[in-house]
Amino acid sequence: MILKHPQFQAYSSIHIAGIEGKPFDIEIQNGRFTSVKEAEPRHVQAEQPQQKLWISPGIIDLHTHLAWTDFDHADQLNRDSREVEVMQAEAFAATLRTGVTTARDAGGILPSTIRHLVKYYQQPLRVQTSSEMLGAADAKGVKHLEGRLAEIYATGAGWIKIMATGGLGAPTEKVTEPNFSEEEFAFIVRHAHANRKKVLVHTWGGVTIDWSIQAGVESIEHGMFLTWDQAGRLAESGVAFVPTTSIYRIAADPKGVLALSPVICERAARAADAHATAIGYAKRAGIRLGFGTDYATPSLHGYNLQEFDTLLDYGLNRAEAWKSATQDAAEILGSGHELGRIAEGYVADAVIYAADPYQAQNADQLRKSIISVVTGADEAGLI
């Protein structure tokens, strides 16, 4: 159940995820938390037992692709526009149902499309977007890049996405080679920041991580070939790291939902193996980590919580993993003053559970424990 922009909602003796042994009385008015206080002891009659509930902030997915309907974009081009629109609306609905109340789309969807989907399909998912991505085809000098950036700004996007290296489509031995010159890369970041846009950088590793640190981008994505030296400098710079770990483990499975070719599966497996080391470096160095899935197909939307499983497998504790999906994710978006916490004055984006989410054994158990999702905004507040 999605509870949209509640005018008034009260929860008595509810437990906040991550705070043990202290139930809280929580009130929401006009879509914001107005009271969060430790509950006074109550006498509950034996014949009227109270259901024990937990609440967490709404989950923030910092790297998703809500407009994409197929792993191979050529397949999406074969679909008619009405079919694509319905599938995009279903992606919004599935994402909300799994407890994700805010998403940063990492390329592919326009702000105008978001407004349309929110309004006509009644799905109050808060989305920040980067519209179109800048990739190898745009490495034609700063004059060309200036024009491309102007086009992206005109869409209303708040983020600029730089495809700084290859990905699963590139041979492993070449995947960290830069798509842009250092001059072009620095120009993009400088121009974006001058126009009050934030920058996220797709990079598997290599020199483009160094460039990202030097330029002061907001976040790097994937980063599985991050070195220990780079991790230290990344932490010092304040640049965030959104590793998107689960998608590579999914892609590596030849019998999985993506059913990719053996060559792609092998590349994904190498990436997944490297990610465990990169997460270890990031944790030791104190890098701000952000939760992101890189999910882009109907078989994956709605299963965003799988990212918790891989983050835990790769060495984060539960508090660190949850912080990456709430408080730290909100800070990365520039919304740490109003999202990512159960606190008075904050937007009431939240998830209600029938069991302690910190004790869930896996993403499937966590997802099944969700009773309702609360969105502080309704559709009108997001368009």
Give, region by region, the residue ranges found by the protein language model.
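Active-site gating loops and adjacent loop-to-helix segments of metal-dependent hydrolytic enzymes
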Residues: H65-L96, P124, Q128-S131, G166-E182, ...
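His/Asp/Glu-enriched, well-ordered alpha-helical/loop segment
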Residues: A194, A272-P357
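Histidine/acidic residue-rich metal-binding segments in metalloenzymes
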Residues: H144-A164, G169-F241, V257-L258, A268-L289, ...
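Histidine/acidic-residue-rich catalytic or RNA/ligand-binding cores of hydrolases
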Residues: D70-H73, R115, I209-A215, I247-L260, ...
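Metal-associated gating/positioning segment near the N- to mid-region
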Residues: L53-K119, E183, A215
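Divalent metal-dependent hydrolysis catalytic cores, especially in the metallo-beta-lactamase
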Residues: M87-T113, P124-G135, G156-A170, K198, ...
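N-terminal metal-binding scaffold of metallo-dependent hydrolase/deaminase domains
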Residues: M1-H43, L53-I55, V351, P357-A360
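C-terminal cap of metal-dependent C-N hydrolases
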Residues: I16, A325-Q327, E331, E344-I383
